[in-house]
C-alpha cells in the first residue's frame, strides 16, 4: 500500500517521506535539558530618545494666517465672502453705507453659510461683523455681552 502512495505522491510532485529514514538516538530523546529559573528581562522603548534629539522647528513658516476685511456693496459680494470662509479664512465685514435690506440679505446668507460650515458670526458694532470658520475661535468680552443680549441666539 505504501508503494502505491509513493507513486501517487511522486506523480503529484510530493515526496513521500519514510519514517524509517530518520533515526533518533534513544539517549537524546530521554534526556531533558536543565532549565534555569532566571527572570526574564523586558526592555520597553517608548521612542523618547528620538524626541530628545533637539530638533529645531521653524515657527515662521510660509503659511501665514490671513484675515480678510470686506465691505460688500451688493448682495452678489456675499458669495465671495463665503468662499473665504470655505478656505478657512476669517472675514470682517463692514456693512456701513449699504441699504438696510441688502445688509439684511447679506447677513442672512452668511449666517446660513456659517452654520453649514460650523463657524461663528459675531457682531462687533452696529454694522461690523466678524465671521470665522470652525478653525478660528473668536473670544472676548464683547462676545459674552452680545450673547447675553441675544443678538444672535444661535452663536456659540
From Swiss-Prot:
The protein's superkingdom reads: Bacteria
| GO terms classed as biological process | division septum assembly; FtsZ-dependent cytokinesis
Q: Where in the cell is it found?
A: Cytoplasm
Query: Which keywords does this Swiss-Prot/TrEMBL entry list?
Result: Cell cycle, Cell division, Cytoplasm, Septation
- What quaternary arrangement does the UniProt entry report? Homodimer. Interacts with FtsZ.
Known function: Cell division protein that is part of the divisome complex and is recruited early to the Z-ring. Probably stimulates Z-ring formation, perhaps through the cross-linking of FtsZ protofilaments. Its function overlaps with FtsA.
For this protein, the record's HAMAP family field holds: SepF
User: What protein am I looking at?
Assistant: Cell division protein SepF
Q: What is the lineage of its organism?
A: Bacteria, Bacillati, Bacillota, Clostridia, Eubacteriales
